Amino acid sequence: MTMIGVIDYGMGNLYSVSKALERLGCPYIVSGDKEELARVRGLILPGVGSFRDAMHILRETGLADFIRSAVQDGTPLLGICLGMQLLFDESEENGPTEGLGLLRGRVVRFPGVTNDGEPYKVPHMGWNRLRFHRSSPLLDGVEEGHVYFVHSYYVVPGEEEVVLASSEYDVDVPAVVGRDNVFGTQFHPEKSGAVGMSILNRYVGIVTGRENG
């Protein structure tokens, strides 16, 4: 059985995620077909672009309901960048838009100005250090190194306990989130060197453990 299904809904960074899985030796498919995705053991939801556009496509294709159902059935899910934001209740981007609602919280834009009135660059692009807050199988054996971010919006969590690691960019940015079989990274692990690859490898291990169980 194929290990991981990378969900293709037209807005994902599919090439770099696929290449990362190849480097890890993990069997995978890239597909937007629900029947194909139903046969894998774990899912990755990548994403680049607008929250509103992404949710529109996921709803129209039936993938939103498929993802919710798969998670409810115990299938591991990893959201990357926009894909992580989509896991939450809603986003303010281009007007309030309902997300997948798998984790509590909302997505808001960086203010672009500090509390002292100093402007800073949005989007946030570059390498920032992770700070771990809670243990998780996704972070077992992973170092608190630097990872690569590209985003203008960040998650304000409804429950602090879902924040496994954070980074700082004027505000405290949830960088790794997780609860039960739902995980997310705001950064691009596939572009984040050894630290990012170790996190992806841990996710593959989570999926593998489920298969062997």
Swiss-Prot record:
Any single GO CC term annotated in Swiss-Prot or TrEMBL for this entry: cytoplasm
Residue ranges of every copy of the Glutamine amidotransferase type-1 domain listed in the record: 3-213
Superkingdom of the source species: Bacteria
Protein name listed in UniProt: Imidazole glycerol phosphate synthase subunit HisH
Associated pathway: Amino-acid biosynthesis; L-histidine biosynthesis; L-histidine from 5-phospho-alpha-D-ribose 1-diphosphate: step 5/9
Claim: Lyase is one of the keywords in the record: yes
CDD domains documented for this protein: GATase1_IGP_Synthase
Annotated EC: 4.3.2.10, 3.5.1.2
Positions of the catalytic residues: 81, 188, 190
Disulfide-linked positions: none
One GO-annotated biological process of the protein: L-histidine biosynthetic process
Subunit (UniProt): Heterodimer of HisH and HisF.
Compartments reported by the entry: Cytoplasm
